[in-house]
Amino acid sequence: MNGIIIKTPEEIEKMRELGRLVAEALDYIGQFVKPGVTTNEIDKLVYDYHVNVQGGYPAPLHYGNPPYPKSCCTSVNHVICHGIPDDKPLKEGDIINIDLTIKKDGFHGDSSRMFTVGKVSPIAQRLIDVTHASMMAGIEAVKPGATLGDVGYACQQVAENAGYSVVQEFCGHGIGRGFHEAPQVLHYGKKGQGPVLKPGMIFTVEPMINQGKRHLRILNDGWTVVTKDRSLSAQWEHEVLVTETGYEILTVSPATGKP
């Protein structure tokens, strides 16, 4: 199965719990996204909530090489992903993706959302909305017998039909006991290609969509990914379980009941 782990019913229950926890953390953190707040302040709140309220641990902290220095990723405006929290205050009109992953009892929960800082331009809001629609189109393609190419194709069609571009160098991933497991989930592709989906697979769908061209560069910190043309970028992320009949989103907001 290309190293893809099919989860047991017991593991699926744990992943439902972890998905709920990360969604609750995103619900909690949203209230603090406003002009004047720094992403470092948000990061400290994330650490405290994961550890002291939820009894877990932020999986990004010290992850990878070089070791990631913070508890979450905060990607503002032209930052595509892996933005490192810092002391720069958010300002009116900014858009920000907050990407959280909690680890607890040996399992992971991973989700990200876009937040707006005060009032944002209609141009920025459209990018946010289309990116969400791109993610949902990918998720809605998930069912037994479909392929990951079907998922990527669906994401890509929505984004490109709106005049945007899809980042190709970063992708979704399997998740469970591992933070990043097989398979890689591309957000572009051809129908019918790639691994076939089977019940019990759990992976993320998390398209990164740029207002301008898809090209990117990585900053000297080894983590922060930005658009090469400095255009805005947006991303949403959910965890998806392949069920016997279709899909189940594991990271729906408990506050709103909406994905």
Q: Residues of each region from the PLM?
A:
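Active-site neighborhoods and metal-handling regions in enzymes and metal-associated proteins
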Residues: 1-259
